[in-house]
Amino acid sequence: MYAGKMGKTVSVKKYKNREKQTMKKTTEFTPTAFILGILLAVVFGGANAYLGLRVGMTVSASIPAAVISMGIVRLLLKRDSILENNMVQTIGSAGESLAAGAIFTLPALFMWAKEHGTAMPSFFTIAMLAISGGLLGVLFMVPLRHALIVEEHDRLPYPEGTACSKVLLAGEEGGAKAKKVLKGLLAAAVYKFLADGLKLFPSEVDFESRKLRGAGFGIDVLPALVGVGYICGARVSSYLLSGAVLGWLVLMPAFVLVGGDNILFPATRAIGTLTTWELWGNYIRYIGAGAVAAGGIISLVKTLPLIVTTFRKAVRGYGNTGRERTERDIPMRYVIIGIVAILLFLCVMPQIRLSVPMALFIAVFGFFFATVSTRMVGLVGSSNNPVSGMAIATLLLASFVLKLTGQTGLKGMTVAISMGTVICIVAAMAGDTSQDLKTGFIVGATPWKQQVGELIGAVVSGLAIGGVLYLLQAAWSFGDPELPAPQATLMKLVVEGVMGDYLPWGLILIGVFIAVAVEIVGIPVLPFSIGLYLPIHLSTAIMVGGLLRAFYERKKNEAYVQDGILFSSGLIAGEGLIGILLAVTAVLGVSAKFDLSGRGISLGAAGSLAAFLSLLVIMICVIKKQEKMEIDS
C-alpha cells in the first residue's frame, strides 16, 4: 500500500489497529482537549512571539504541548487517551506556528507608524491579518494531506510529527516527561525575573578587542537561547555562529582597517570612530539582509522540482480517499468556500482593503508557498523551514507590483507588508499542520477533526498574538534594544528599499554574493546568513546549547538527548511568559519598583556569567537526575 520497506508499513498498521481498539472507549474532540489546547496555544504562541521578537527565531511546540497534555490528562483527570492528547497538541501547537509567521512582518506596521507619526495599526487589523493567514494555511494544506502524508509516508519523515507520535505512543511516561518541561519553565522564569525584572545582573555581556579594532564579541546569557541551541543541535548552531564570526570578527575589523577616516553611507561619521554596535547597525546588518534574502530565494529555487511533483500528486490524490474515519478530510467544497470568504474579507477589511488582483496574488502565492513549506518540513523539519525566504520573495514581488501600479509611500508599504504577513503565516501554518497530520496518521486520528482543531487554534492564536504585540509595543517599542524584532526589521528594509530606492545596495549585494559563495561550498545558506544578520551575542549563546546536546549525543544516550529537549522547551516557554509579564509591569508603570540596579545593586558581567553557568549546571543535573529516577523505577 505504501512505497518503501514493509517493516515501516506494518508498524503504521500496528498503530492504527491499536487506535481502532481504543476508539471504542474514547473520543478525540472533547471539552478537555478543546480548553487545554486553547490554553497551550495562547501560552506557546505568546512565548514564541516574545522569543522571535527578541532573537529572530522560534521553535516547534508540538512535543512540549503533547507532554504537558499527557501529564494533565493522565495525572490530574485520571484517564489515558492518545487521540485526546493528540488533539490537544494539534490545537496547542498552532499558536507557535502562527506566532512564527506574525513576528516576521507585523511589527513593521508599528515601526512605520512611529516613524511617520501616524496612528498605530488597530488590534482588529493585526488580529484579522494573523487569523486570515492562519486559516488559509490550514485550508491550503487540506488537499495536500493525502499526497504527502499518506502516499509518501516512507519518503517524507516529518521529523517533529514522527517524534511527537513516539511521545504520544509512550504515553505512560507523560507525567514524568511533563515535569521536565515544567522544571525548565520554572528555572527560566526565575532566571529571567532576576535578570530583566530585578536587573540583578545584565542579560548581555560585551567584549571588545584592543588589538583588532572594530571586532566585537559577546553573549546574551538568556535561558531561551540555550534552549534553542539544544533543540537545533550543534551543527545548525555552528552555522549560525560561523556567520556571526564572519560579520563581527572579519568584516567589521576590515571596515575599520580600510575605511579609517572615510565616511561611508549609511553612517554619518568616520568609520574609525564608530562603535562595534554602530558598525553592525550601519554595515553588517545590510550585508546580512542581502545574504538572508539570497539564501531564502536559493532555498526556494532548489525545491521547485519537488513543488511540481507535490502539486501533481495532490491534484491526482485528493478525493480518492475511502470512507474510513482515518481517511476523511474536510470536504473540498468547504475548503473552497472558506478560502474565497477569507480573500473577500481581506478586500473589504478596514485599513488594508486589498484590490481583487492583490487578493488573487495572495491565493496563488499562498498555495504555492504552502506547498513549498509542507514539502520542506517533511524533509528537514519545521526548524529549517525557510519561511523568511518565502516572506522576502513575496515582499519583493508585491512591492514591485504595487510600485508599478502607483501604490507607493506609506500606503503602498502597508499593503505590501499586509500581503507578506498573510503569506508568511500561511507558510508557517501549513508546515505545522502537516507535522500534526503526520502525528495523527501514525496514531490513527481523524484528519478532518485535526484540521478543525488547527482552525480553532489559528483563530484563538491570532487574537492572542494581536494582544501580545500590542502589549509589547506599549511596554517597549519594536526596533529598540529590548525588543529588536530582527526579522520584521529586515522585512521593513526590503519594502523600503523597493519603494524608496535609498538602501545601500552595494552592501546588500555583498551579502547576496556571500550567500552564493556559501551555497557553492555546500554550507546550508539560510542558517549561515541568519547568523551573519543577527548580533554575535545571540549565536554564541545558541552555540552553548548546541554543544551541550552534542556532548550527550556523543555519549549515545538518546534518553539524555530527549530529556534535554523537553527541559529546553520549558526554558523557552518560561522566558517568554516572564517577558510578557514584565511587559505588563512596564505598561502599568510599576517595573521600576523591581529594579535593583537603580539602587546600586548589580552583580555586573561577572554575575551574568556566574548565573549562566549555574543555569547550565542545573540543566545538566535535572537531565541526569530525571534519567536516574526513571532507570531506578
Language-model region placement:
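Accessible peptide chain termini
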Residues: 1-2, 23
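Alpha-helical multipass membrane-protein architecture
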Residues: 13-633
